[in-house]
UniProtKB/Swiss-Prot annotation:
UniProt superkingdom: Eukaryota
Primary location recorded for the protein, binned into one broad class: nucleus
Compositionally biased tracts (Basic and acidic residues): 171-181
InterPro entries: bZIP, bZIP_sf, TGA_domain
Region listing for Basic motif, in residue ranges: 183-203
Protein name (Swiss-Prot/TrEMBL): Transcription factor TGAL11
Protein's organism: Oryza sativa subsp. japonica
GO biological process: defense response; DNA-templated transcription
Keyword annotations from UniProtKB, A to Z: DNA-binding, Nucleus, Plant defense, Transcription, Transcription regulation
SUPFAM superfamilies reported in the protein's UniProt record: Leucine zipper domain
bZIP domain: residues covered: 181-225
């Protein structure tokens, strides 16, 4: 049994050692051993061959295990081949060489020479095993080459996927833009229109600021020119004013600014054809604004009555029409009445009666003020002399009497302001809402034109002033003959 098994093992593993040998050569070498060495020499040769084949089988198994380990690591993506050439080189390295490891120095064992029939079967089995081993090695090389090609194709596939994703996202964005809700599209259009209007308003506002800056610079130049010529708007040059007068000037400046805004509201309400209720509120506000002016004037009269009477708070053109420190009611009615047409008969009668009563009150106040002036002049004239010590006492007495008479001047100014205020209230009662709006608007425009006239007068060039002075001299010379004609009178 031992010899039979020993004879089978070498022939079973023979296919692993003889890579590339053919069956006739094997049979010829077997016959050669049988003929040359007899039975003992063939047994010795096959004993050595058995040892070599066993060693070769162990070596081939280890190489097969290493090849399987390398293939597993390739599939686990630890050390992939970069190219197909590298995979082919690894496959060629893993293939065992077509030689036998035969060492004659090993101990030789005797065995019986197998029969020719057994030898033929063993050689056939070895040839089959050799073919299967070659096929397995070829399959492993092809798998490694396919694996390397797959690793080379991975970056290209990733790039293609990125391109597809980008194209799909762009397509989806276009589709979302096309399928937006009409409300959203309309809202976006409204937002764009609002932004455009906002930019236009900003541009117009900047232009308005620039034009206002230019006008302010022009006004400063005009004011400086007026000061150099000795003409000051709303005040006497170099005059000392009291604290009450300075406070009134500041309050009056703010009152003028508020009056400009109220005039704009009246103008807008008339052109917009507002209802009577809304327009009445604007008219009542304008009337209350004039009541505020009369309150300021009463406080200024108590602080410094001469400041109101002299009209230093007004412009030069307005001073020409002052009456007791303000406008004359009858003259104002004559100026405003033509702009209130059409008027009913009842309104005409009411305005005429108001004008007559105003004239009567004005005459009474004017007569009283004239008497006060005459009395004050007599008191100051008969006051004695300051140089004479004997008459110094009488002088101080007359001065105290003159101061008492001057205090009556405050009463005249307050009564004149009351007459002005009552005239405005009576006009408000007689006229309709729209007529009253036109009345207050006409009064405001009248005083604005007077102030504008003063500004133009103050801003005249000096050459025109010199020419006017020359013309006045010529007129005075030309008027001398006419004066001589009426010298007797």
């Amino acid at each position: 049994m031992g010899e039979a098994r020993r004879g089978q093992n070498p022939h079973h593993v023979l296919g692993y050692g003889f890579h590339g040998t053919t069956l006739p050569n094997s049979m010829a070498s077997a016959n050669l051993f049988e003929q040359g060495g007899g039975g003992g020499g063939g047994a010795a040769y096959f004993g050595e061959l058995e040892e070599a084949l066993v060693h070769q089988v162990a070596t081939l198994r280890r190489r097969a295990q290493q090849t399987a380990t390398t293939t597993t690591s390739h599939h686990g993506h630890t050390t992939p081949f970069s190219t197909a050439a590298a995979a082919a080189t690894a496959t060629a390295t893993a293939r065992p060489p077509a030689t036998l490891d035969i060492f004659p120095s090993w101990p030789m064992r005797r065995s019986s020479l197998p029969t020719p029939k057994d030898g033929c079967s063993n050689v056939t089995a070895d040839t089959t095993d050799s073919e299967s081993s070659s096929k397995n090695n070829g399959d492993q090389g092809a798998a490694a080459a396919d694996m390397a090609s797959q690793f080379d194709q991975i970056p290209q596939q990733q790039q293609k996927q990125h391109k597809k994703m980008a194209a799909s996202s762009t397509h989806s964005d276009h589709r979302m833009t096309k399928t937006l809700d009409p409300k959203i599209m309309r809202r976006l259009a409204q937002n764009r229109e609002a932004a455009r209007k906002s930019r236009l308003r900003k541009k117009a506002y900047i232009q308005q600021l620039e034009s206002s800056k230019l006008r302010l610079a022009q006004m400063e130049q005009d004011l400086e020119r007026a000061r150099s010529q000795g003409l000051l708007l709303g005040g006497s040059p170099g005059g000392n004013t009291s604290a009450g007068a300075a406070m009134f000037d500041a309050e009056y400046g703010r009152w003028l600014e508020d009056g400009g805004r109220r005039m704009a509201e009246l103008h807008g309400g008339l052109h917009a054809h507002l209802p009577d209720g809304d327009l009445r509120a604007i008219v009542d506000d304008a009337l209350a604004h004039y009541d505020e002016l009369f309150r300021l004037r009463a406080a200024a009269a108590k602080a410094d009555v001469f400041h109101l009477i002299t009209g230093t708070w007004a412009t030069p053109a307005e001073r020409c029409f002052l009456w007791m420190g303000g406008f004359q009611p009858s003259d104002l009615l004559k100026t405003v009445a033509p702009q209130l047409d059409p008027l009913t008969e009842q309104q005409v009668v009411g305005i005429c009666s108001l004008q007559q009563s105003s004239q009567q009150a004005e005459e009474a106040l004017s007569q009283g003020l004239e008497q006060l002036h005459q009395s004050l002049a007599e008191t100051v004239a008969n006051g004695g002399s300051v140089v004479n010590e004997a008459s110094l006492g009488s002088f101080m007495g007359y001065m105290a009497l003159a101061l008492g008479k001057l205090s009556n001047l405050e009463g005249f100014v307050i009564q004149a302001d009351n007459l002005r205020q009552q005239t405005l209230h009576q006009m408000h009662r007689i006229l309709t809402i729209r007529q009253a709006a036109r009345c207050f608007l006409a009064i405001g425009e009248y005083h604005n034109r007077l102030r504008a006239l003063s500004s133009l007068w103050a801003s005249r060039p000096r050459e025109i002033l010199v020419a006017d002075e020359g013309n006045c001299g010529e007129l005075s010379i030309a008027a001398q003959p006419s004066e001589s004609q009426f010298s007797a009178f």
